[in-house]
Amino acid sequence: MATQTRGYTATKHQLLERLAKIEGQVRGVAKIVEDDRYCIDVVTQINAVRAALDKVGLGLLDGHVRHCLIGGHGGPTDPDEQAQELMGAVGRMVSR
C-alpha cells in the first residue's frame, strides 16, 4: 500500500518538533498557574502559545495550497470548491 503524501509530508519531522515545543509551552502555562503567578504572566504565555499554533497553522495552509491545490494532490478539484475550502479554513483560524 502506498503512503499518501500531504502538504506537510516533507516537513513532518519539523512539524512534530514544533508541536512538541508547543506542548511544553502549554505545560509551562499550567505550571505558572500552579505556582500562582501574576495573571498577566499567564495571559502572556497563553498568547505565546496561540502565536506558535497560528504559525504552525499558517505553515500547514501554505503547504496545503502548494501541494494539494496547486500540485493537484487531493482535495476538491473544482476551483470554487477549493476557494471555499481554503477560505473556510482561514476563517476558522482567524475567528476566535
Give each language-model segment a name.
Residues 1-96:
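Solvent-exposed interaction patches of small proteins and small membrane subunits
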